[in-house]
Amino acid sequence: MTDNNHYENNESNENSSENSKVDEARAGAFERFTNRKKRFRENAQKNGESSHHEAPSHHKKEHRPNKKPNNHHKQKHAKTRNYAKEELDSNKVEGVTEILHVNERGTLGFHKELKKGVETNNKIQVEHLNPHYKMNLNSKASVKITPLGGLGEIGGNMMVIETPKSAIVIDAGMSFPKEGLFGVDILIPDFSYLHQIKDKIAGIIITHAHEDHIGATPYLFKELQFPLYGTPLSLGLIGSKFDEHGLKKYRSYFKIVEKRCPISVGEFIIEWIHITHSIIDSSALAIQTKAGTIIHTGDFKIDHTPVDNLPTDLYRLAHYGEKGVMLLLSDSTNSHKSGTTPSESTIAPAFDTLFKEAQGRVIMSTFSSNIHRVYQAIQYGIKYNRKIAVIGRSMEKNLDIARELGYIHLPYQSFIEANEVAKYPDNEVLIVTTGSQGETMSALYRMATDEHRHISIKPNDLVIISAKAIPGNEASVSAVLNFLIKKEAKVAYQEFDNIHVSGHAAQEEQKLMLRLIKPKFFLPVHGEYNHVARHKQTAISCGVPEKNIYLMEDGDQVEVGPAFIKKVGTIKSGKSYVDNQSNLSIDTSIVQQREEVASAGVFAATIFVNKNKQALLESSQFSSLGLVGFKDEKHLIKEIQGGLEMLLKSSNAEILNNPKKLEDHTRNFIRKALFKKFRKYPAIICHAHSF
């Protein structure tokens, strides 16, 4: 509606608008305007001017383009407008545009000015969404990204970021083996590529202290040593691992970092940024390079009400986003989960209810690194007057370090040893323990199978398993659940939604991270291929062009510069196997042999041959394992012996006189004979001697 229409409305409804001072003012303004117009026409008639003289040009109707206003009044009103413009210019505020077309008839000029405002704001928003366009696209600088673990799998995270002269390694984690890797407790990344580039590695950069990010550090330092940068908790837990491995002297490589304080590491400038996750003191990384800024989120969720009241440093992330980020590497673990991940503090009401209603002992099992989860459980144990027994080596160690470093504060008098549990009534005891993943050597498993020295599960026990099974551990978790239920314990697991929350961002948190960082290029990390592929779709929905996203797998090498992202090669990657009881690596060939034995059995042959007669001696020995039953073994051995007799008769002197060739000749025959009979390739143990 135009200003004139406002005035006409108010004049016709003057009596009904008396209670409004604003309406009265407008009506008065219209009356004064009408009187001025009337006097103007009367003066014009007295001066002999045309009686149909038009009103000043700024009141002319815009649909009369041929009607020219009087020059005198045109100049007069031009002066008025110029004066108004000068006055506005002198009082102009940055970010504010004054409207000049206030009193004109119609809305064309008014809307033009508003449209200019729309265009200006749209331009500002587009520039705000794409600050990375400030980067120098002519720069020849680039960085190379090489994941050695954590892509195509859950866990085992390790990544190399390098320039031609310098490199950093982000995290060094372990993962759990799938079922069937007999005698293998953990997997660690293959360090071969690090040996190739060792002369330019400036440091190991740790994002947080979970096993899938620090578990491989002692094995790495047995082979290579570099400065190791991290927050106090990360270094504390790594230091404890080094003690167990006899590497205490390598603590001299540790560098304690301060968050929000960029430091130089080789050619990189790195800042640790506080992030919330399921372990204390987690960090994202801002890595400044000559090519541009890289943000690595580490594992994260955006928890606004964390237990320690230290939420994610969104301001610092946004700070780098506004400056312009070339590349974002972001956690993909929960990329299939819609919405947001609940806060760690939401567990409290469920814990409160369970502890309040428990009639006997409460046994709570979770990841030993989830210190805030353990802390909350202990707080409710104290609230309901229970003594706390912490059982399990890793649980005791992590809790002690967190207390000593001042991350948590708990009264020492509330704690008892495992051998003191029996001295207290069941309803006055809380046991915090390891074993949430069904590990056969864990305290919970040994309690459930009556193998623990001091504690066995009772029918009145409440067992809270406050964790989800890591992929690959489902069968182990199911086994321990079966043992607990057979003991008639009450088990709180997945049916209680509020006793466990994830430490990883769901889709809405991933979107917020993408919107804060506004990267030009995006590499989703941490997860199997289906996780990073889903994260890619989320990034596209947040405005990252599909051509600027690459889905990596372990061993891929991707080069990124201000104007491009491309795969440039593939390096050898894989896993090394570790026996966690001896802390020793297991050769790949040993694991393969174990798989052969488990899947197809073993056949052993020690033969003695008379070269002249080309015949087996009676002292030859044969045995099998996992092929046939005891009754059928004699028949199988007789078949193999008969076949070998025929083989020796047709063998030439060169084979019979060479023990190595005779052994290979015998092994190949047995292998083929067993495959023909069983359609399997058992492990063959063969020794041959000729006389």
Swiss-Prot record:
Documented EC number(s): 3.1.-.-
Region annotated Loss of region decreases protein stability, still able to interact with RhpA, but has decreased RNase activity even on ssRNA, chain positions: 1-132
Residues where N6-acetyllysine is found: K134, K140, K323, K337, K397, K511, K547, K634, K649
Positions with biased composition (Low complexity): 10-19
InterPro entries reported in the protein's UniProt record: Metallo-B-lactamas (IPR001279), RibonucZ/Hydroxyglut_hydro (IPR036866), RMMBL (IPR011108), RNase_J (IPR004613), RNase_J_2 (IPR042173), RNase_J_b_CASP (IPR055132), RNase_J_bac (IPR030854), RNase_J_C (IPR041636)
Outcome of swapping K511A: Altered cell morphology and significant cell lysis and cellular debris
Post-translational modification: Acetylated on nine lysine residues. Some of the residues are acetylated by multiple different mechanisms. RimL is partially responsible for the acetylation of Lys-323, Lys-397 and Lys-649. HPB8_1270 homolog is partially responsible for the acetylation of Lys-323, Lys-397, Lys-511 and Lys-649. Acetyl-phosphate-mediated non-enzymatic acetylation pathway takes part in the acetylation of Lys-134, Lys-323, Lys-397, Lys-511 and Lys-649. Acetylation of the remaining residues Lys-140, Lys-337, Lys-547 and Lys-634 occurs by a yet undetermined mechanism.
A Pfam family hit: RMMBL
Localization terms from the record: Cytoplasm
Keywords: Acetylation, Cytoplasm, Endonuclease, Exonuclease, Hydrolase, Metal-binding, mRNA processing, Nuclease, RNA-binding, Zinc
Renumbered residue ranges of the record's region Disordered: 1-89
Job description of the protein: An RNase that has 5'-3' exoribonuclease and endoribonuclease activity. Degrades 5'-monophosphorylated ssRNA and dsRNA, considerably more active on ssRNA. Association with RhpA significantly increases the dsRNase activity. Degrades RNA substrate with hairpin structures at both ends with low activity, but presence of RhpA significantly increases the activity on this substrate. Stimulates ATPase activity of RNA helicase RhpA. Involved in stabilization of mRNA but apparently not rRNA.
Entry's family note: Belongs to the metallo-beta-lactamase superfamily. RNA-metabolizing metallo-beta-lactamase-like family. Bacterial RNase J subfamily.
UniProt xrefs under NCBIfam families: MG423
UniProt subunit comment: Homodimer. Homotetramer; dimer of homodimers. Interacts with RNA helicase RphA, might be a member of a minimal RNA degradosome complex.
Name of the protein this chain belongs to: Ribonuclease J
